[in-house]
């Protein structure tokens, strides 16, 4: 019976336990077998008994007052699942441990992976900026002889289209098309890096990059990039 109940458990994130009688031992055996979080809604003494039974053995268990309470808390569990399946592409200038731009951030990135399962891939900010260009991908300053992810003529067609759509859809735009395009190029280039590094989140030390004057040279900031990423469901921030 336990084997039958456990079928497809690899596709399940959370099991809700319901008792027709009081087979507490079966519920415990099932939870130990599948290794997945379990929960129960208000079920008289069963809620307290099952909670004690599971938690005493280090099993993840939730006891909810009602379905409304359960539904609300499951948003937290969904967020945890997303974080576990996420990989951050972090552009760094000097150190990946402490951000000069955000000293209030976490000081040990390994703790993110340890606690949430989120992985981090690092890329040199200078390599990234080199490749947000239409230059020869084999001639980038930081990686000479190694083919980069530089923008292509085909990419530019898409970038031009996105630039025009962005301007046309704006309630107000005080930037020239040329300047808007530079920020769209940055976003497009960063998304190429996200694909190449199989990442779904992005961060860069924006103020620290401003201090290098590379962004001044490139004539864009990360602001629009972060906004466009966020609109597409890609967490992105300084």
Question: Model-found features: residue ranges?
Answer:
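An N-terminal assembly and electron-transfer interface module characteristic of large anaerobic redox
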Residues: 1-238
């Amino acid at each position: 019976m336990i084997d039958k109940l456990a079928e497809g458990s690899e596709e399940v994130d959370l099991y809700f336990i319901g008792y027709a009688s009081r087979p507490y031992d079966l519920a415990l055996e099932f939870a130990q077998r599948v290794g997945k979080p379990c929960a129960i809604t208000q079920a008289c003494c069963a809620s307290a008994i099952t909670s004690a039974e599971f938690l005493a053995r280090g099993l993840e268990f939730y006891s909810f007052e009602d379905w409304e309470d359960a539904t609300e808390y499951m948003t937290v569990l969904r967020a945890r699942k997303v974080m576990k399946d996420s990989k951050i592409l972090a552009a760094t200038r000097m150190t990946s441990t402490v951000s000069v731009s955000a000293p209030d951030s976490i000081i040990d990135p390994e703790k993110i992976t340890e606690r949430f399962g989120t992985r981090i891939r690092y890329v040199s900010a200078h390599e990234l900026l080199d490749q947000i260009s239409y230059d020869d991908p084999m001639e980038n300053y930081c990686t000479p002889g190694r083919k980069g992810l530089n923008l292509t003529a085909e990419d530019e067609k898409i970038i031009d289209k996105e630039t025009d759509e962005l301007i046309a859809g704006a309630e107000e735009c005080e930037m020239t098309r040329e300047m808007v395009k530079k920020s769209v190029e940055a976003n497009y280039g960063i998304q190429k890096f996200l694909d190449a590094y199989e990442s779904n989140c992005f961060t860069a030390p924006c103020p620290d990059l401003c201090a290098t004057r590379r962004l001044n040279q490139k004539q864009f900031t990360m602001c629009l990039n972060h906004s466009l990423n966020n609109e597409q469901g890609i967490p992105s921030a300084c």
